[in-house]
Amino acid sequence: MRKFILMSATLLAFASSVCAQSVWDRNHLEKVKAQLHRPMYGAAYEALLKNADSLLSVEPLSVMVKKKVAPSGDPHAYLSLARYYHPDPSKADGLPYVNRDGVTNPEINLYDRNRLGETAGRISTLALAWYLNGNEDYAAKATELIDAWFLNPATRMNPNFEYAQMIPGVNDGRGRCYGVIDGYSFIEMLDGIALLEGSKAWTGKQNKQLRKWFGSLLDWMLNSEQGLEEAAQANNHSVAYDTQAIALALYAGRDDVAKKIISDFPEKRMFRQIAPDGRQPHEMRRTLSYHYSHYNLTHFIDIFLMARKLGLKIDDKVSPDGRSFYKAMDFIASYLDKDLDEWPGQQLSGYEGKKQDVARDLWRVAEFIDTTRSDYRDLYQKTRIFNPEDRFTLLYYTPDDVDDAFVSAGNSLRYAISRVNDEKKKEDNASKRRVNPRSVDKDGKMTLVHPHDWVSGFFPGELWMMYEFTNDPYWRQEAVSHTWPIEEAKWHGGTHDLGFMIGGSFGKAWELTGEQSYFDVVRQASETLCTRFHPEVGAIRSWDHNRDRWRYPVIIDNMMNLEMLFKMSESTGDPKFRDVAVSHADVTLRNHFRPDGSSYHVVDYDPSDGSVRMKMTHQGYSDDSFWSRGQGWGLYGYTMCYRFTHDPRYLEHARKIADWFLNIPGMPSDHIPYWDMKVPGVDVADNPDIPRDASAASLIASGLYELAQYSDTEKAADYYYLEALLRKRNLKESKK
């Protein structure tokens, strides 16, 4: 019998905990907890723990801390100031206060509102940290904060908002109906407290007391004059009222109340507050109209999330004349890529920041409410500023391998930036004008290079790619600062590597910003590169050195420089750049490849008649061997050429290289190739004594990913599979 009672109590506690979850999703949090090793979740988790650790020493806040007391004289009475009301400058005493919509009065800090929000946020943080980490110190601190604000007879708040958002000089200092919204932060807090129910610190007695407290607050909201007046509002306040009432009802175990509000919501709120074109007329009148248009829809989304817990779905309801939540969401989402002056209402401040809030809510809808809205997912990915440490990541986001890769890359690049900045200050680097990193040796020594080095554009190119993915201005600023120091390379006619140097740096900057200054550099670099083209050979010369051995060397690497030329013809309409690129690709296709699809590294020509003098290697094991990176240059190069020309010969050849790579003898099981696939020892399975070439693997993975998009289903599956294998292996190595 004792075991039965204990089991029943445990099941009831678990059931009440699940029901009490309102906006947060327990299933999602369980998945997050199991995947904290992933870079994306790990970054947010570490930020959460850092925040939680900082809270362990804070003093609990309570309504007893405020500098002023409600007219009732009871210090336990919650008291807050109407946010947008300020002293009347025309009155000696400033009374009554007057409205300045959208402008917060700093006197708000003298009252309870900010401390309520801060307490709720602290409890949410500590509870989530306990759930994910298991440190009972977090649960104990959260319990201490809950006790001080809600339960301790000496410090607790009365369960009402009778004096919330009062206006000095009006109604004898009594609160207004709008003050009910001050408790909105309780919603997430209660989700956190529901997690705490599994901790040692949070007792069943405290849990019962808190449910009773919030039950009393719910009764006050449902029956008081202020509560009823708030429920009757025609704007975001009534929607926020419904959201709070549903959350309190779920927490207090009064599902009938929650279900009634949810069932009435479409007719009572949605269809009355949203116009057929998606505008919200009451919110559009505000001085922060974009903010409030979204703010109201956030409440909608919270309601839809809570409705799911009760098996109800109302987000898809549409009025006879077309009013719906999705009309409203689509309306504000359509301005995510538009400037403020295009918004049809007034928005005094905070437009860009609010767009980030809109993007996050698009994700919440697509992830938890209507999973068919892939357009919302895409728009979120396109417009959000990537911040792995954002709490949103833990609560709502599901990262993929690309997200994790960019988190790891971001960490590495931030460290690299600090190292580069230190190295550039050293006299030897400064005197030789070394500006960007080339490599770091096994002892951690970083090597910088001059603007004319073939890898000088790699680092700024990576920074521009970080900016492209993250939309974070930090990466743009860093990319700019590491791009312009190599500008002089645009005149460097002694190299074939201008595509590597300028195309990936200035070219990417031009692509992402559209700024003329970047375009001008890329055009000059393209002109300079074309000076190395010999019409008799029909290809761009590679090296100028070793003239005693070579007369006109062309290396397979040069395929990578053609992309800059193709893009320049597309942008200018001048065919000469494309003509050079096509000629070079054709000559290389004719002379560089063996029948099986593998490539020589170097082909030397006689510039007098264009004939082939010799075929050899310079970086591979032997003249007839398979230098892995060279095979990658070819695969990516011809796939890229097909992208610009749609010439089937290029596509066919790219596939030939890919198929050769798929079937080459001696390939390690993870498909990260040895540095050369004909070096002695490749016949030994996964030979640990032969260096691998991760750069070749990355290059091949990029080529395969694009090539798969041009291939039939069966062949694409092979390419995608291998690309994924290579990518995951490289990601795994990057995390070590």
Q: What are these regions, as identified by a protein language model?
A:
Residues 94, 137-140, 144, 153-159, ...:
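Glycan-recognition and catalytic cores of secretory/periplasmic carbohydrate-active enzymes
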Residues 19-228, 263-266, 308-309, 316-470, ...:
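Extracellular glycan-targeting catalytic surfaces
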Residues 3, 16, 55, 162-164, ...:
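Short, intrinsically disordered/low-complexity patches at protein termini
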Residues 1-21:
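Bacterial Sec-dependent N-terminal signal peptides
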Residues 3, 8, 120-128, 147, ...:
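Contiguous, well-ordered alpha-helical segments that form the cores/surfaces of helical PPI scaffolds
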Residues 248, 289-299, 305-306, 343-371, ...:
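Long, charge-rich low-complexity segments
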Residues 168-173, 230, 279-288, 314, ...:
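Short helix/strand-bridging catalytic loops that position acidic/His residues to coordinate divalent metals
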Residues 240-320:
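Flexible, glycine-rich surface segments
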